[in-house]
Amino acid sequence: MNNVKELSIKEMQQVTGGDQMSDGVNYGKGSSLSKGGAKCGLGIVGGLATIPSGPLGWLAGAAGVINSCMK
């Protein structure tokens, strides 16, 4: 389990589709981000540890974890 890679901010933006905070997406409501943010973050961290190594494995796995978290 030593294959865990720390993703840079740029890599995470590529996986999630860009820097949404600076694109004017409305986070001002606070409800969706504050209620699910911590739970979602822990799910992503836990999910990333189980993704197979290799660039395609990381992209597919990280996208899947993030996508399932956003539902």
Swiss-Prot record:
Localisation per UniProt entry: Secreted
Principal location: secreted
One GO cellular component term: extracellular region
Membrane spanning stretches: none
Superkingdom: Bacteria
Coiled coil: none
Example of a GO biological process term: killing of cells of another organism
Record's keyword terms, sorted: Antibiotic, Antimicrobial, Bacteriocin, Disulfide bond, Plasmid, Secreted
Disulfide bonds: C40-C69
Pro-piece positions: 1-18
InterPro entries: Bacteriocin_signal_seq (IPR010133)
Keyword Disulfide bond: yes
Function: Has antibacterial activity.
NCBIfam families found in the cross-reference section: bacteriocin_sig
Official protein name in the record: Bacteriocin carnobacteriocin-A
